[in-house]
Amino acid sequence: IEDAWFDCRGFVKKSITELFYNVSDDFIKYYYYEIILRCNLASASDIIRLLIIYQYGGTYVDVDTLPYTDNIYHGVNKHIEEEGIVESDSFLLFKTLCFLKKINSEELWSEAVIGCDENELGVDAVGFEKIKRLIEQDLSDFSLDMILPLGETYVYKNLLALGSLRRFKGVYFNNFISSHQKSKAIRIILRTMKKRYRFLEKNNCIFDYYVDDKTTCYLTRLLTWRTELITRDYCVTPVLTGPGLIVEVLLGLAYKVFNIDCSVEPHIIAEYMQNSDFGIALFQHNIDTPDGAYSTWRK
């Protein structure tokens, strides 16, 4: 993309290399590990976004994330609630596609939108026709000012706020992060990431494949780093650089700071953190987008 495209839209394009000037050389090494040895742009991006949010503060949003738009579907959402329909990922993506067709002034019921049939949406043919009719009604008087702005984001000074969805209890995403500059929580997350990469190096799992010797510890789950994208088990990246890493650090802080008894299971605390009053979970986003649907880490 040419610089002019960014300039006319008020974007400032910056080189990521300057992010590594003020931190340990380890992070540029980890970045190149992911790019060169694994071709893993997801982990490389995870590292960069944490460095950005730590050094600059503010709000980070993935390019394939859209604003929260489900509020525009008054009629269809009421119908879904009355009929007890469970919205699958396909259903939510379908609603997003319809919305995108509307704002681009394209034919609503094009082949691109009807790519998923009623079976994928969890309804029969009659129910599908009714849903299409209700969506058309909801979008008939749509205007861009109906999309809720992000508004002010309140984040505790040394914590961070993280993307989440109300329908997934205790689940978080790093597509949407907000933090003050030099947040202590982000610093601890980066330090923990460094410890995990060093564990991989110590066990010779960066340049060689892991051979299971039956000994296990808390970080043994990371040792298949080299083969993760080959076997497609996708269990390393989230806890090495992604949302799993962030949530595990937050849970550890919760246990320590509030002296929570170890009998309280982590998933209970993770669900509790989704309470809007705590300012940790961010819900004003939509990850059910055409580009987001292709993410390896959601499969």
Task: Give the positions of each predicted feature.
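Glycosyltransferase-associated regions of secretory-pathway enzymes
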Residues: 1-46, 59-299
